[in-house]
Amino acid sequence: MAISKKIYLSQSAFCSFIDRVHPKHYYSQAFFRYFGQEEYALFTDTITLNQVYNYIYKEISPSLARDFLKTIVLSNINIIYPDQSDIKAALKTLIGYQSSELTFSDAIMAVLANRRGISQIATFDYLHPLFGLSAFFLPI
């Protein structure tokens, strides 16, 4: 079975890549280098972009947060816009999930990835076992 060349980028993947003092910075650099070399299609959503923007604005600098948005506009990263059915599905997932640690942003990310046929998430956070999604790992 062929491995899909689609990756969904989470907040932790972006933040660790941008923040040079982040403990996972070198790992995220390797992720993005690999994605470029192997010509992966990269996806993220508007909620994740807002979270990353707020992180950069508060933790690093407002001007870098603005530059981040400019870079996203010029990049090949596909931005997924959740519609009403995506939000309702995420809310149902959130309400029906057995763990109270699932956040709305994680639920919407899982729903959007599942509906777009994206099976791997680039993340350094715990990935809840939803819809058969898996965390991306660099091949050895």
Predicted segments — roles?
Residues F14, L49, H128-P129:
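A generic structural signal for short hydrophobic patches within well-formed alpha-helices
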Residues M1-K6, A110-V111, R115-I140:
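Acidic, PIN/NYN-like endoribonuclease modules and their adjacent C-terminal/linker elements
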Residues A2, I79-S119:
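Active-site neighborhoods of divalent-metal-dependent phosphate/nucleic-acid chemistry enzymes
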